[in-house]
């Protein structure tokens, strides 16, 4: 027995007993989704981390499975685009997350050894991609992923406000040192 996927428009038509202007409803839904996306502010701590990274002389890159114009449009709207040394998006690669191609490209463009890279991710596919690229990954779940459970990331933060960038870097350095020393002892 196969079960068909739930279609909310079909269910609504069934409930009201008449057909609905589907295309018009879909357009309204997309417009509302866009309105919600465009009203979202910068997440807490993001701007401070980017400013601190600049002051520390750290290179910053962004890897997104979205289209480049979407990504750069949001970064410009939020006043964050100038913080990034490189930005790579779906248009720049053959395969997006969970494939590591995006992260590999960003790391290559930054000219930083993979073992010195820290990835901040909000999606499970992003975590998988970062780990496949051999990168240290910190998971900061978003509203959609906060209820998920994953042990794939090296560290989880609920918000960048939980810890300063300098304290986080010290913690990550300590954690990496402990991992390396355990590996050599085994």
Residue map of PLM features:
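N-terminal helical cap/lid subdomain that shapes the substrate entry/recognition surface
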Residues: 1-56
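Asp-based, Mg2+/Mn2+-dependent phosphohydrolase catalytic module
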Residues: 51-55, 67-186
């Amino acid at each position: 027995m196969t079960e068909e996927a739930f279609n909310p428009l079909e269910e609504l038509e069934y409930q009201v007993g008449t057909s609905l202007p589907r295309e018009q409803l879909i357009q309204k839904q997309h417009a509302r989704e866009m309105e919600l996306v465009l009203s979202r502010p910068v997440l807490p701590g993001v701007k401070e981390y980017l400013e601190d990274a600049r002051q520390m002389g750290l290179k910053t890159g962004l890897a997104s499975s979205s289209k480049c114009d979407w990504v750069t449009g949001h970064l410009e709207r939020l006043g964050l685009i100038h913080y990034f040394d490189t930005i790579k998006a779906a248009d720049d690669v053959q395969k997006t997350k969970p494939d590591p191609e995006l992260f590999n490209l960003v790391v290559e463009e930054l000219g930083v050894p993979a073992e010195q890279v820290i990835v901040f991710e909000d999606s499970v596919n992003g975590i998988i991609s970062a780990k496949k690229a051999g990168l240290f990954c910190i998971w900061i779940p978003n509203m959609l992923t906060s209820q998920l459970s994953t042990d794939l990331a090296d560290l989880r933060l609920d918000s960048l406000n939980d810890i300063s960038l300098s304290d986080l870097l010290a913690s990550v350095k300590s954690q990496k040192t402990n991992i390396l020393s355990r590996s050599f002892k085994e």
